[in-house]
Amino acid sequence: METAFSHPPQSSSSKRKVIAVVGGGLVGSLNACFLAKRGFDVEVYESREDIRQAKVVKGRSINLALSHRGRQALKHVGMEDKIISKGIPMHARMIHNVNGKRSPIPYGKKGQYILSVDRANLNKELLTAAEAYPNTRLNFNHKLHDWSPKTGTMTFIGSDGQKTETQADLIVGCDGAFSAVRKQFLRQSRFNYSQTYIPHGYMELTMPPKDGDFAMEPNYLHIWPRNTFMMIALPNLDRTFTCTLFMPFEDFEKIRTGDELLRFFHKYFPDSVPLIGVEALKQDFFRLPAQAMVSVKCCPYHLFEKCVLMGDAAHAVVPFYGQGMNAGFEDCLVFDEIMDQFNENLVAVLQEYTRVRVPDDHAIADLAMYNYIEMRAHVNSKYFIFRKYLDNLLHFFMPKTIVPLYTMVTFTRTRYNDAVNRWHWQNKVITRGLWLCGFVSAAGGTYVLVKNSHKLPSISAEQLWTRILALKLF
């Protein structure tokens, strides 16, 4: 019996396949490069106008952190060097305390860094790269209205309201968290889907240059952690910083006037006020309402042999691990590797892609949720900082045995799911080791005290307790 996610026999036709990429954003445009490089006829359909010609760029503008996974995908299509040249290295987190003190926390080993890149510029570069292939065509102002999972026929609505039909051998849905392609999946049985909005929104502010240079150290991801909310700042090539305030919606709604805004910032982010500027802060804050963030999970990623989901269409993640774009780019690379493995047999390729990629993408979605708590709360903890240094120290002496989670996720292509499983195992080992060290130290101290008790001055239990309290240990 055939289900929506089983496959009828594939045609043995030798005709080159037509692949439709729905969505001309970051993942869609990179995917077009991968597929065109293989010799497929690629049609890219984007609902918006060409971002390279738009006077005003609509959509999200949160700065992006490009790391190893994304770079490997770009390298595969010859784009890594060009993109890196327009990025700014960030070697560590810079933690800003309320009192103005700054403390760096390195991301990894010396020489390891992530890159701050501009979303719009990256999208433009990838579209231009895709368009350079003679077997690729970009179609803008084409909004997907419906499509058939049986025939691969798609209906688009143009900017003039007219409908057009076209057909493809494979439809690749790269059209974001609110994917129109994915709607067809929802009509099928045995398709699992969930979305979760977090109770926090985000708002972007701009920190201008100071005396023609960066207002803060540029090679850091700056973080102002405040337990239930936080602000971050990433550097831009024009020497500005894009600051993003993440906070519960109800807290945003409490700030209604410029005076309330200034009181809030002077209380929680005092060092940022003179750097952003009072008037600029007010203008940016009240320009637009706080934006929502959603996490999307679904399974499987393919439908018959006609369609596959990638990027946010398959796994939108909240932006707190800096892996949303990197995971989407790795989707393209993994799909390409599986195409090699199965000699471009789409029946086998799509099934394997779902099998391999779903657990990894779900793992990074969960990690992104966890990391929000870490970024806004745990980085203030002395134990957190101690564990970071301990993990890095153990990694230095035992590089193959102990690998920090952030290192596995950001600086390697270890599968996300494997990284999480290994992290849990390492935590158990390290925690038990710390408890053992504590027990041995306590036992050793007790033994020394007992052995030398006759040398100690006589003191009552009440006096001993009073002296302990005086040390303010509790």
UniProtKB/Swiss-Prot annotation:
<keyword id="KW-0521">NADP</keyword>
<dbReference type="Pfam" id="PF01494">
    <property type="entry name" value="FAD_binding_3"/>
</dbReference>
<protein>
    <recommendedName>
        <fullName>Kynurenine 3-monooxygenase</fullName>
        <ecNumber>1.14.13.9</ecNumber>
    </recommendedName>
</protein>
<comment type="similarity">
    <text>Belongs to the aromatic-ring hydroxylase family. KMO subfamily.</text>
</comment>
<keyword id="KW-0472">Membrane</keyword>
<keyword id="KW-0560">Oxidoreductase</keyword>
<dbReference type="GO" id="GO:0019674">
    <property type="term" value="P:NAD metabolic process"/>
</dbReference>
<keyword id="KW-1000">Mitochondrion outer membrane</keyword>
<dbReference type="GO" id="GO:0070189">
    <property type="term" value="P:kynurenine metabolic process"/>
</dbReference>
<dbReference type="InterPro" id="IPR027545">
    <property type="entry name" value="Kynurenine_monooxygenase"/>
</dbReference>
<comment type="function">
    <text>Catalyzes the hydroxylation of L-kynurenine (L-Kyn) to form 3-hydroxy-L-kynurenine (L-3OHKyn). Required for synthesis of quinolinic acid.</text>
</comment>
<keyword id="KW-0503">Monooxygenase</keyword>
<keyword id="KW-0274">FAD</keyword>
<keyword id="KW-1133">Transmembrane helix</keyword>
<dbReference type="GO" id="GO:0004502">
    <property type="term" value="F:kynurenine 3-monooxygenase activity"/>
</dbReference>
<dbReference type="InterPro" id="IPR036188">
    <property type="entry name" value="FAD/NAD-bd_sf"/>
</dbReference>
<dbReference type="GO" id="GO:0005741">
    <property type="term" value="C:mitochondrial outer membrane"/>
</dbReference>
<comment type="pathway">
    <text>Cofactor biosynthesis; NAD(+) biosynthesis; quinolinate from L-kynurenine: step 1/3.</text>
</comment>
<keyword id="KW-0662">Pyridine nucleotide biosynthesis</keyword>
<keyword id="KW-0496">Mitochondrion</keyword>
<dbReference type="GO" id="GO:0043420">
    <property type="term" value="P:anthranilate metabolic process"/>
</dbReference>
<feature type="transmembrane region" description="Helical">
    <location>
        <begin position="433"/>
        <end position="453"/>
    </location>
</feature>
<keyword id="KW-0285">Flavoprotein</keyword>
<feature type="transmembrane region" description="Helical">
    <location>
        <begin position="393"/>
        <end position="412"/>
    </location>
</feature>
<dbReference type="GO" id="GO:0019805">
    <property type="term" value="P:quinolinate biosynthetic process"/>
</dbReference>
<dbReference type="GO" id="GO:0034354">
    <property type="term" value="P:'de novo' NAD biosynthetic process from L-tryptophan"/>
</dbReference>
<dbReference type="InterPro" id="IPR002938">
    <property type="entry name" value="FAD-bd"/>
</dbReference>
<dbReference type="GO" id="GO:0001878">
    <property type="term" value="P:response to yeast"/>
</dbReference>
<keyword id="KW-0812">Transmembrane</keyword>
<dbReference type="GO" id="GO:0072015">
    <property type="term" value="P:podocyte development"/>
</dbReference>
<dbReference type="GO" id="GO:0071949">
    <property type="term" value="F:FAD binding"/>
</dbReference>
<dbReference type="GO" id="GO:0006569">
    <property type="term" value="P:L-tryptophan catabolic process"/>
</dbReference>
